[in-house]
UniProtKB/Swiss-Prot annotation:
Name of this chain's protein: Hydroxyethylthiazole kinase
Example of a GO MF term: hydroxyethylthiazole kinase activity
Binding site for ATP: 118, 164
Annotated residues for binding of substrate: 42, 191
Function: Catalyzes the phosphorylation of the hydroxyl group of 4-methyl-5-beta-hydroxyethylthiazole (THZ).
InterPro entries: Hyethyz_kinase (IPR000417), Ribokinase-like (IPR029056)
Organism: Listeria monocytogenes serovar 1/2a (strain ATCC BAA-679 / EGD-e)
Listed cofactors: Mg(2+)
Tagged with keyword Protein transport: no
GO annotation terms (biological process): thiamine biosynthetic process; thiamine diphosphate biosynthetic process
Keyword Transcription regulation included in the entry's annotation: no
Amino acid sequence: MFDFMTLEKVREKGPLVHNITNIVVANDSANGLLAIGASPIMASAKEEMDELAKMADVLVINIGTLDGELVTAMKIAGRAANVAGTPVVLDPVGVGATSYRRKVVQELLAEIQFAAIRGNAGELAAIAGEAWEAKGVDAGVGSADVLSIAGKVANEWSTVVIISGEVDVISDGTRFAKVANGSALLPRITGSGCLLSAVCGSFIAVQDDAFRASVEACASYAVASEYAEMELERKLPGSFRPLFLDALASWSVEKTRAKAKIQESGEHK
């Protein structure tokens, strides 16, 4: 099912990815999108959200650094994107960390139809209402079944769920996939998950099947990180970061096909 040609579509079409993101990761997210062939715009003024919704091929909302004005812009942008038929991706950074973040995410979910939600296990557990020990914006620890969490959130909100971690889990509520690739250095550079959300958005922008797009995005991203790690003399995050950007720019369909470890299944009980 997965031929990984979505990457080539991104490069051919250069989708415009509108990011309302956090101040920590904006630069890396923009550079990562440029590396894969997408066209990023980082804009958050509420006055221009309606216009941008008509221009963009996808909207990626990231709640990493929140304030009231930004939340207003997110809601305006998301509603306008829905009207325009533009897919919207949510990255609920640290949603389980504070009551304010939980409130904002619930409001966003109630007001906007999302094509995909990408987060770590702790973040998706918080949305699912499952017990999980949050650690700020990090995944933390918990005993709930990750596949069940993915399916529950996907079905409740009619979306594709991407839970990233040592093994990525992707589900649309009916189909499930695991991607068992990725460098151990990814969690050691800030914003690697946020960039993955943006990459998933760029794939969804050019592929009608958001589940397929998300699986191929996760696999391509993870395989690129493995190639970057192979180039390192010393396995340190500061050296890994620029090599990963280079790997994103030079990754190929053939490399992903050769190394991708994907396990797909039907409905999870």
